[in-house]
């Protein structure tokens, strides 16, 4: 027991000299060692060893599952009853006495598992062929050795061991499935056997020295206890690099023609080697000197070859025949453009044109009923109609065809009774035949160049001035009622509510309404926005009424004048913070409701902005956002910067010229306003003269009963039960007040300084403030 069995050379000598009886004794001892093992193999190891698709042990490095099987097999082995190599020396000269190699076994390898693969004896008198056995692992105890018999028949104690004759190589190929390793052997050429054997011997040596490497999963198929026999067809098991030519022959079958082809592979789970084996044979497309062990890569076990591009049948590749253009294009309609009429031209009734006529432009002659001529066509000066020429019965003349000036109508030529005349075809001085009396020419007759149609035309039809003036009076009442809210009036509203069907003459109606407003009420209709066409009512310079309003609006307009002054003195713009700071000094605060002004914030940011007195906008590029106030469009027309500056100077008992910059700016604006007013007055006078508008426009009766209150829309609160309560003042009283004004009608100029008279200064102050209401 001092010597350790050699699992390498001793096993090869045992394989060469063993007899049938010795083989039977060895198998019986092996079976007893397995049956009396202390711990049965686990279900995991049994399942791995008896799987249906188990592949033989490979010369490749083991995987994790193979390591687990080795540990289970080592734990299941009997500690002390294992077969000892030195006990095999009791059989004589030709027995196991050659187990001398047990002394030569390395001391670091205490145990080795003997593995008999493809253990089918070749005959009744032949020794058992344990063709492949290799050390696969070590157990926990170095004095124990486990024998693992694969592909050996298990039987009872009294069973006689009969080893059937080994089938031939062709029969094994046909009857047994091929594994991944067996197929991989067939892919190598015979010339590479020696080199591959050396490589495999080196790998087996590495496996033998590794303590944690076990068999591959499903390396051998074990038979069940009932005696059923399974055979392993592993043909590529290496015993220290020894491999016979028979291994390659297992995967090759001979056919009648003498050529060799690869046998089909059985279905199973293919497993690729984690580490490639280097060789000089390179599969197609593989890196240099590397053979990949994956059977599905680079190799095709079924002999399948890459097919060339799929050939389309000749019939399927034929493209449809190209569309063939008809030999002759059939056009039932003759080409009509351009048309060159040769000479002669034969009509339905034979008509011979004496001179050739070439039509200059495109002419379409679809049929005689829709005959068209070119707009600029003129007949030759010397053309005469033949005496016997008759027009077709269904022929219609062109609507814009001009008759030659010197063309005389044939005496026997007559038009059809139902022939329609074009509106501009007959000249005014052309003689009309007696049978044309029933035809009524259109009033839009146009004469030829040498006709005297202008002498026969009478004066233009006079307009109904009374209807236009009546509609203008309605517009005056409408504008005065709409101005109650101080919201600018849109031209579209005037056209929709009052003018209506007189839209073609609406400029004259609006101008007549302006004339009535100026002459009777001292009010002027001013267009403040040329793009949106917004209109407001302002007092004329002669009325000295200032800003129109009622008594209840006096506090609001006074506050508005103060705000306009603050904006003007701060560079024509004032931020919201600056404006509220100035109003706080007057006792006015936002958020506190005033008894007369109401909500101050709403008054400044909504009402005055809607009435176009102020412009409230965001300061550009302000973060957080800030807002500022500017003058509105209405403020520029109802007052001026010079009036506001004089108001501020009067309050502070100072001269307006003390603020030099503001005074010069206000003076320039006043001069520009005078020039614009003079140009506008001249344009109005010219328009009224052209329209015939004079004093007779205001001479007629005046009545308020024809006003349509349902057309008016109101944005402020009011007494909707009594429409007349919406009128802010009595119009006739206002008219007479303007006539009896105690202020002079003519001023010395837009700028009144301290040198003016007291009456002039008083009038200027009131004009600057802009408040003069009828009580």
Swiss-Prot record:
The family database entries (Pfam families) matched by this protein are listed as:
MAGE (PF01454)
Q: Where are the sequence repeats?
A: 292-297, 298-303, 304-309, 329-334, 335-340, 341-346, 347-352, 353-358, 359-364, 365-370, 371-376, 377-382, 383-388, 389-394, 395-400, 401-406, 407-412, 413-418, 419-424, 425-429, 430-435, 436-441
Extent of Polar residues compositional bias = 52-63, 84-100, 107-120, 149-178, 221-235, 247-258, 296-308
Q: What does this protein do?
A: Involved in the apoptotic response after nerve growth factor (NGF) binding in neuronal cells. Inhibits cell cycle progression, and facilitates NGFR-mediated apoptosis. May act as a regulator of the function of DLX family members. May enhance ubiquitin ligase activity of RING-type zinc finger-containing E3 ubiquitin-protein ligases. Proposed to act through recruitment and/or stabilization of the Ubl-conjugating enzyme (E2) at the E3:substrate complex. Plays a role in the circadian rhythm regulation.
Residue numbers spanned by region 22 X 6 AA tandem repeats of W-[PQ]-X-P-X-X: 292-441
The subcellular location is:
Nucleus; Cytoplasm; Cell membrane
According to the UniProt entry, its GO molecular function terms are: identical protein binding; transcription coactivator activity
Q: How does it sit in the membrane?
A: Peripheral membrane protein
Distribution of this protein across tissues and organs: Ubiquitously expressed in many adult tissues, except for the spleen. Expressed in osteoblastic and chondrogenic cell lines and also during embryonic development.
The MAGE domain sits at 468-666
Q: Which organism is it from?
A: Mus musculus (Mouse)
- What is known about its subunit structure? Interacts with DLX5, DLX7 and MSX2 and forms homomultimers. Interacts with UNC5A. Interacts with TRIM28 and PJA1. Interacts with NGFR/p75NTR and RORA.
User: What InterPro entries is this protein classified in?
Assistant: MAGE (IPR037445), MAGE_WH1 (IPR041898), MAGE_WH2 (IPR041899), MHD_dom (IPR002190)
Output one GO BP term. Answer: negative regulation of epithelial cell proliferation
Asked if the Swiss-Prot or TrEMBL record annotates the protein with the keyword Lyase, the reply is no
> What is the protein's given name?
Melanoma-associated antigen D1
The GO cellular component terms are: chromatin; cytosol; nucleus; plasma membrane; protein-containing complex
Q: Where is this region: Disordered?
A: 37-330, 374-409, 437-463
> Where's it mainly located?
nucleus
Tell me, according to the record, the phenotype of the null mutant: Animals show shortened circadian period and reduced total activity.
* Low complexity bias spans: 39-50, 309-326, 375-406, 437-452
Swiss-Prot/TrEMBL keywords? Biological rhythms, Cell membrane, Cytoplasm, Membrane, Nucleus, Repeat, Tumor antigen, Ubl conjugation pathway
